[in-house]
Amino acid sequence: MKVYISADIEGIAGISHWDEAAKAHATYQEFRAEMTEEVVAACEGAMAAGATEILIKDAHDTGRNVIASRLPDCARLIRGWSGHPLAMVQELDKSFDALLLVGYHAKAGTEDNPLAHTLNLRIAGLSINGALASEFRLHSYAAGLYGVPVVFISGDKGICAEAAGQVPAITTAAVSEARGASTISIPPRLAQGMIREGVAAALAGDRKRCQVKLPESFVLEVTFNNPIDAYRKAWYPGASQSGPQTVRFVHTDYFEVLRAIRFIM
């Protein structure tokens, strides 16, 4: 079995402040280590279910967070950013049997995580077909392009609820929930156990039930914090400015939407 893991940090156990996600701050090292251990737990669950190949995308900030020496021999790690439109699922293709998402977080414009955002902090929100979109939605649709089922997600309570609403058969592991600028989190060891067991169960189940069906067409709207950014980005071919802070792009091919996001964002 060949499995893809996309890993972020803002949805791991215990995290509650931007300092904990940024290399410049001393507390980052603790949460970098926890991000790594949650990825390792996902690998262990995958191997228990029969995975022999695991590709991991370090998908937080610089893309250089996961401690490679902790990974099993059957894993390969993508570090840094190539600039490819698949972004957080770079190199994903139809050869994979499943996509797992670890440490994912609530979308911009929601109260489910003090670190809620979508892709970066320059935007107030990103919507597809009129609904605010999370990094989960963006990349689960990418998996849908290649027929790869999205079988597991761990992260905050908000993103797990969103994922279950979009893919009812997905296995979720909610490790924290928000109260304003604070979080209530389970202990890291418990989170790692939930991820390990959840991944094993998800991969052993009927993965076809976790296939993501794509809409027939896509209306992308990106709302920037600064109107100057919207003016500049609206010059992308096919895009237009639909408001002082908003850029709009319409297409029937989701890969073209991902390409637009790559250049507009």
Regions found by a protein language model. Name each.
Residues 120-146, 154-159:
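Active-site glycine-rich loop that binds ribose-phosphate moieties when present
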Residues 19-44:
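Short catalytic helix/loop segments, enriched in acidic residues and glycine
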Residues 178, 191-265:
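C-terminal accessory domains and tails appended to enzymatic cores
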Residues 1-4:
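Extreme N-terminal starter segment of soluble prokaryotic enzymes
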Residues 79-122:
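N-terminal glycine-rich phosphate/adenylate-binding segment common to multiple enzyme folds
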Residues 142-203:
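Active-site rim beta-loop-alpha module in soluble metabolic enzymes
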